[in-house]
Amino acid sequence: MPFVRIDLFEGRTLEQKKALAKEVTEAVVRNTGAPQSAVHVIINDMPEGTYFPQGEMRTK
């Protein structure tokens, strides 16, 4: 059962996230042979001020 987690800065519309989840699901099915019903896509909206690569705050 493939789980795909995507972390994005918040601000995408629901329609954008639906389209992304659909395309990611199709890619997982195509490349792994997993049935579509087994693929789970989790999109996490990250508020600004919560991402610190190399210890420095990253913004959009």
Curated annotation (Swiss-Prot):
The positions flagged as active site in the entry are P2 (proton acceptor)
Alphabetically sorted, this entry's keywords are: Isomerase
Q: Which molecular function terms from Gene Ontology are attached? A: isomerase activity
- From what superkingdom does this record's organism come? Bacteria
Its EC number(s): 5.3.2.-
Recorded hits in InterPro entries, A to Z, give:
4-OT-like_dom, Tautomerase/MIF_sf
Q: Which Pfam families match?
A: Tautomerase
Keyword Transcription assigned to the entry: answer is no
Q: Of which family is this protein a member?
A: Belongs to the 4-oxalocrotonate tautomerase family.
- What PANTHER family does the record point to? 2-HYDROXYMUCONATE TAUTOMERASE, TAUTOMERASE-RELATED
Protein name, per record: Probable tautomerase SP_1017
Q: Which species does this protein come from?
A: Streptococcus pneumoniae serotype 4 (strain ATCC BAA-334 / TIGR4)
